[in-house]
Amino acid sequence: MVKILVTGADGFIGSHLVEELVNQGYQVKAFVYYNSFGTWGWLDYLSESTMKYVEIFQGDIRDPHGVKEAMKGVQAVFHLAALIAIPYSYHSPDTYVDTNIKGTLNILQAARELDINRVLVTSTSEVYGTAKYVPIDELHPFQGQSPYSATKIGADRLAESFYRSFSLPVSIVRPFNTYGPRQSARAVIPTIITQLLSGVNEIKLGSLTPTRDFNYVKDTVNGFIEIYKSDRAIGEEINIATQREITIGKLAEELIHQINPAACVVCEEQRLRPVKSEVNRLLGSNKKIKELTNWEPQYTFEQGLAETIEFFKKNMNLYKADRYNI
């Protein structure tokens, strides 16, 4: 049985990826961030029937020795561990360099030394910056509009360099905005939903005019797995996108209509990005992933939102809807 290491397994997308890999018959080694509480993030909420196929490795992606130890005995690595909050990257950019760039280098170097069969490095649509044309394909230029996106550009280019320099069998997976159950309330869809479910009538947001291309998390993780299964994807960088966009304002209107029609949106200054840092439009092309793999999105936006709302209704005790957390 193939064993796959998932870094960032304790996070939002990572925990869903662990779940789906087990469902598809893989053994999983889950790299989770060490903490003194002995908790495994969202993996603590997965079923016992899933977790019996999961081996936990507690460590820190910034430590090359621990990373290499974690990678022993696996055939493939799905590298998702990263710092992703854009506002926090304004606050602590050095930490983003250490985690996102050095952490990725640790994975690539260990994979090279251990002859790992496949490496998937997780990128982000933020590397493109505001769209210069749409739909955004993989040839679109990069623009570091935040310290976060700059570190992800750096990590991507390191991955490319290991493919070109050492023939490391790496693929760069570039999801557009992913949403779904277990997502942090820092993200826009959960922040709207949790505020609405808390009963307040004023929903605090930043800019309402940017557009985003939203992937439901189950489609995102299936994109990862289909890229892994395709040898044609080696050495490639590949978008996961729906080719549909919606403004943040329209998204808020839709969720307000579904949950609390009496609510309204107010713009809160602390939630605004600096003007030159705001990515105003993201609409991705999924032509390449469809050409190189068997991936097709299975969820409509309406279906994904319904499942997401249902999760938050049942788990509001896990969130602090009254606080803005960068």
Stretch-by-stretch model annotation:
Residues 17, 192, 221-228, 252-255, ...:
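Hydrophobic "lid"/C-terminal helical patch
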Residues 228-232, 259, 312-316:
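Short, hydrophobic alpha-helical segments
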Residues 48-54, 166-169, 193-204, 230, ...:
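A short C-terminal helix-loop "cap" of Rossmann-like NAD(P)-dependent dehydrogenase/epimerase domains
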Residues 1-178, 248, 299, 307, ...:
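N-terminal Rossmann-like NAD(P)+-binding domain of SDR-like oxidoreductases, especially those catalyzing
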Residues 217, 237, 272-296, 307:
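Conserved C-terminal active-site "lid" loop/helix of NAD(P)H-dependent oxidoreductases
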Residues 153, 178-191, 198-203, 217-218, ...:
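Glycine/proline-rich active-site loop of Rossmann-fold NAD(P)-dependent oxidoreductases
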